[in-house]
């Protein structure tokens, strides 16, 4: 993991098209702004984990493909 230090209003750039800016620092909380292309999904980790759990549950409950012949 790369660890970077940034101050308020400083940023980092990922892959030339994703910019992360430190918007605010208040106590032990940091607010970040993310500029990314629309096709790049950006989620808080807890939201991402919930999406993954929902996708796994959907896949587990999805009917078998009718083209599958055993």
From Swiss-Prot:
Q: Which domain of life is it from?
A: Bacteria
Q: Which residue windows are transmembrane per the record?
A: none
- Primary place of residence? cytoplasm
Q: Which family does it belong to?
A: Belongs to the CsrA/RsmA family.
Query: Assembly state and interactors?
Result: Homodimer; the beta-strands of each monomer intercalate to form a hydrophobic core, while the alpha-helices form wings that extend away from the core.
Classification via NCBIfam families: csrA (TIGR00202), PRK01712.1 (NF002469)
What name goes with this protein? Translational regulator CsrA
Q: Give the organism, scientific name.
A: Rhodopirellula baltica (strain DSM 10527 / NCIMB 13988 / SH1)
Species classification: Bacteria, Pseudomonadati, Planctomycetota, Planctomycetia, Pirellulales
Gene, per the UniProt record: csrA
